[in-house]
Amino acid sequence: MTNAPPDYLVIGHLTQDLLPDGSVAPGGTVFYGALTATRLGYSAGMLTAAAGWAAVPPAIQVVGVPSASTSSFAHSYVEGQRQQLVHAVAAPISAEQLPQLWRRAPIVHLGPVLDECAETLIDAFPGALLGVTPQGWLRRVAGPLPAPMRPVPWRPAPELLRRIDLLVLSVEDVQGDEDVVADYARHCGCVALTRGADGVTLYVSGVPRHIPASPAQALDTNGAGDIFAAAMLLQLFETGDPDQAAHFAATTAALSVEGRGAEALPTRGGVLRRMRGEDGRR
């Protein structure tokens, strides 16, 4: 660990995707978020709980909570809809496990996937730009493992929502209930509702506007939502402009789905070239 906090700190479970061929791929908001930050030129750190974190690139600082297992998911598609089956759940994560130095990180991203982070973490970083992807607070494991997940309502107090600088959710996260997203936006100053290839509804001070998706030839959409959220949070830190940040993030996510795996993540230069209408892959 260095003598300075990471520029970007992401908190949540590092996960394993159990693939049909028997192989395992790393995933989770912490994985894709931290990779995005490093590709865009930031130092990154993650606070996670897992049985191990050898899959995390060495450029990313890791504070790991020991766990008997790593949160693991098997994915399948039924009538075009992704289905997830949970095979293992790692230990919970709390503010007490956070190094004191890391509490001064300027950009913090809370990314629960299985309710592993307490909402009280929202108040642990009063000086940071705080982003939240609340996917893991909107679902629970439905029974003994292996088991599917069931949606649950997330009703944070208005004062917690006011502390969040950027809230990013997908239409799937809220089961298509856009009224609840509008309710969040009454208290949270910047809310992004992602719609995949249909773009983003961006609420700023409660007022919605449409941000189009950046055109892409999609090969692998795994992690695209997490990549969007991290890129938008980082660009919001740089510019303070939600619209500009959302367009930048949409382009970053579009480039990421045009390849497979973490290697497809673009650099800052690649994103800017694509935004100018050039080939961001060069």
Briefly describe each language-model feature range.
Residues 35, 73-76, 199-203:
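Short beta-strand scaffold segments in enzyme catalytic cores
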Residues 28-39:
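Histidine-anchored nucleotide/phosphate-binding helix
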Residues 107-182, 198-199:
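Conserved beta-alpha-beta core of the PfkB/ribokinase-like small-molecule kinase fold
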Residues 4-10, 15-24, 38-131, 274-282:
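Conserved N-terminal subdomain of the carbohydrate kinase-like
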Residues 20-24, 143-145, 181, 260-262:
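Short, solvent-exposed loop/turn segments at secondary-structure boundaries
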Residues 2-4, 153, 180-282:
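Conserved phosphate-binding/catalytic region of the ribokinase-like
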Residues 15-18, 137-138, 216-217:
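A short, flexible beta-alpha/helix-coil linker loop
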